[in-house]
Amino acid sequence: LSQYGAVADAIKKFNYDYGLFLARLGYVVLCPDARGIGERRDEAFQKDEEEMFLRSTCFYLAHMAEPLGMTVAGMCTWDLMRLIDYAEERGQWRTDNLGCLGFSGGGMQTLWLAALDDRVKMAVISGYMYGYKDALLKLNGNCSCNYVPGLWKYYDCGDIGSLIAPRPLLIQSCAEDHLNGERGIANADEQVEIIRQAYRLFGAKNKLIHQHCPGGHQFHKEGIKENLERMEEML
């Protein structure tokens, strides 16, 4: 896809090529297209224009799913669980040390998958650790994959992240990420503190790493290699 100008520009801006980056570090990497993304977009709505390649059709999925008691986040999590099943049944790779890394919408999927499937032994969530009130309810224009009806009344992003404890977890937050909301990175810090309390209960506070990064909404490769090695030693 990098032959297309709009895609190449986005890869450069957001560092979207983190799958390739991990492969070059020696990891076996599976990079599935999520529902409504990439080859799983609904072309009937978007057509096949280059500038649409990295946009989603999650709105149309959510529009049909939510009246049926389903969510895009739930469907994506189910897909990723089936991907782990595939990796296990294939029998080609070790699956006792599985990790999951995602940025933005991929961070959302990593959050839910790691929280709900303990086969994920370590996780990296980049660009997705926000208090729902600031980031989803006060901001308009977020992707429909983010929304779980009524969830904000009872739980926040940090509560979901707490379910990952005591497994190694790295969270990246960017200081100027517009999705932090009006209070900036303090919104992310509050959610990480909720998670940190869970790690303290397990006596595993060293297994939670919170990396503050400069700039806007993007994945940061700086320090990833060293942090992954550190996290592997904790397994």
For the regions a language model picked out, list residue spans one by one.
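Alpha/beta-hydrolase fold nucleophile elbow
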Residues: 92-104
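Short glycine-enriched nucleophile-adjacent loop
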Residues: 80, 107-118
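Active-site loop->helix "elbow" adjoining a glycine-rich segment at hydrolase catalytic centers
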Residues: 72, 104-107
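Mobile cap/lid helix-loop segments that gate and shape the active-site cleft of serine hydrolases
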Residues: 59-67, 82, 120-162, 166, ...
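Cap/lid segment of the alpha/beta-hydrolase catalytic domain
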Residues: 1-78, 89, 134-138
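Alpha/beta-hydrolase-fold catalytic nucleophile elbow
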Residues: 101, 126-127, 172, 213
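C-terminal catalytic histidine-bearing segment of alpha/beta-hydrolase fold enzymes
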Residues: 193-235
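Short beta-strand/loop motif that positions the catalytic acidic residue
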Residues: 164, 171-173
